[in-house]
Amino acid sequence: MAGQISPTRSALLASKASLKTASGGADLLKRKRDALIGEFFALVKDALAAREQLGGVSKGAYTSLFGAKAWDSPEAVESLSLAGSGDYAVNMQIESIYGVKVPRINIPERTQTTNFSPINVGARTIQAATDFGGVMEAIVKVAATETKLRRIGEEIKKTSRRVNALEQVVIPGIEDDIRFIRSVLDQREREASYTQKKIKAKIEAKAKQQRKDIQSGNHGSAAD
């Protein structure tokens, strides 16, 4: 960049301002990255807990399913699963975490609306259906938490790349420009000082010679 910049005092001031801006930007990005890292590790705990919860409710649901098949027959369970199948509604909103857009999913409270008569269905089959409803809730929670985790992780990487670009490329480049401009300005100042000294020396030498000439002329007149 030094070869593309004009080595003037105004350019030096502009480069100093750019350096201050870049350094401030790097500091802000590092603070954002640190905050995101803290949020990331908190979400890791939530994600692990959600996964553990999913494993627990899944195990319980399959235990209920096996019991239902044993007591109420596989045909009855399959018939109930077809009768009770349908859409699973969730409420999703977008929230911002340090500028990162992430989904916030709310699971509405389940209501016991069924397409079958409980009189004709065994208690274990109904329990299995209820337990698998809990599995769906756990899956949604895992998906929401891991989506947040992934997006924040991506933002951490992006922010780190921006910090590295500023600290390793932009800021050193501006510092090189400042050193180059200062070097040229210092050289010009030295040259100007040297030129002034030479001019001053010539003027003094000329004045001295003129004084000598005047003195010589005065001596000649006195002798006449």
From Swiss-Prot:
GO terms for molecular function: ATP binding; proton-transporting ATP synthase activity, rotational mechanism; proton-transporting ATPase activity, rotational mechanism. InterPro entries: V_ATPase_D. Residues 205-224 are annotated as: Disordered. Transmembrane segments: none annotated. GO terms for biological process: proton motive force-driven plasma membrane ATP synthesis. Keywords: ATP synthesis, Hydrogen ion transport, Ion transport, Transport. Residues 215-224 have a biased composition (Polar residues). Pfam families: ATP-synt_D (PF01813). Signal peptide: none annotated. It comes from the Bacteria. Residues 205-214 have a biased composition (Basic and acidic residues). NCBIfam families: V_ATPase_subD. Belongs to the V-ATPase D subunit family. Produces ATP from ADP in the presence of a proton gradient across the membrane. This is V-type ATP synthase subunit D. It comes from Deinococcus deserti (strain DSM 17065 / CIP 109153 / LMG 22923 / VCD115).
